[in-house]
Each structure stands twice: as C-alpha cells, then as structure tokens.
Amino acid sequence: SSVMIDGSHLPYEENVALTKQVVEYAHQFGVTVEGELGVLAGVEDEVVAEHSNYTQPEEVIDFVTRTGCDSLAISIGTSHGANKFTPEQCTRDENGILIPPPLRFDILKEIEEKLPGFPIVLHGSSSVPQEYVKIINENGGKLKDAVGIPEEQLRKAAASAVCKINIDSDGRLAMTAAVRQFFNTDPDKFDPRQYLGPAREELKKLYTHKVVNVLGSAGKA
C-alpha cells in the first residue's frame, strides 16, 4: 500500500524529478509514496554517504508541492547503522560512555510550521541499546563505539508531526545478540529452530518496548 523512494543522494532537481515519476506511477494504483529530502550519513541499500546534510526547511514546500509525495523523510541528525556518530562528534559521561549530539529539533519545528499536518518520517533512528552491544562484544563480536539516538529524543519526535520512525538496526542487534549468546553457550548446536527461537523472542521483546514505551504507537494499527 506504500513505497519509499530515496533520491536524497541526487542533486535537488533530480531528486524532485525521480520522486515525481514514482508518485505519478504509484498513485495510479492507490499506493502512497514517501519521499526523502536531506542526506543521512551511513550505508543503506549500497548507497553510501560519509556525512549528513540536514534538510533545508526552505525547500520542503517546493519539494512536496512539485512531487506530490504523501510523506517526507527528513534529516535532522540521525544516521544509518549502529555507529551513528564518531567519538569526535560525541561527548562522554563520567563513566566514559559516549553521549551522542542532540537531534536538530529546531529544523523539525521549522518544517512543521511550513508543512502543517504533513506526515514526517525519520530514518536511521535506532537507539543501539548498549546491553545488546555488550552481549555481542562479549560473545565474539566487534562493535566498537556503537551508539544511537537516545530514546527520550525519539519520544519527543514521536509527539510531533513525525508519524514514522525507522529503527531497523535495533532489531538486527537484538537478534544478533541472542544468536551469539546462544552459540557461546551451546557451541555444538546447529539446528536453526533452536537458535532462531531465542532471536525471535528477543526481537519481540524489543519491539514491544519500542511500540509501548517509546514510539507511542500501541493500539494504532
């Protein structure tokens, strides 16, 4: 019922043209389209961006009007993957734990004012739970300086015009932690039904927490 077209890595006019083309085709079949404006750092679907480029609020009205997209993914400081920020971009608490920079809620507010009521999307918003990082690293993994978006910032975003928040990396971390822990405890096992069961349960636990306690989307399906 919906698709996402990410032309954010293209020059602005090319992004507009590509998104408009997808919208015109998809709308023939009643399919809604999510466009994207602003670049997130990281790797997604083999598209690599070394640095984030924040969404420019002055472009959003023109982009939405010309493309006809139904929702808009923006860049306000999130990024793809489990290593969302370099140590140099972060501060550290008294225990040496990395504290990521805050999201640019000022940009979000300005976009909301220019597009009142329009559905906004955040990609690259996994929190990278440190308990999963710890389990992975204690069981053969090598996730160095992995840090994500604090949940309190996601709660704030979810209370705004943001209607969709992508947290794929958190799910990957949950399953990987469960699988690594399983094999470290039972290295002689090889039946997928045995190690995927705990992985699914951990994934279920994670998303239940996110839906109920962070994203505020419980009961809204």
Show where each model-derived region lies:
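Alpha/beta enzyme core
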Residues: 1-119, 130-135, 139-147, 151, ...
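Short catalytic/ligand-gating loop segments at beta-alpha or beta-beta junctions
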Residues: 122-127
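C-terminal alpha-helical cap/extension of soluble enzyme domains
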Residues: 138, 149-221
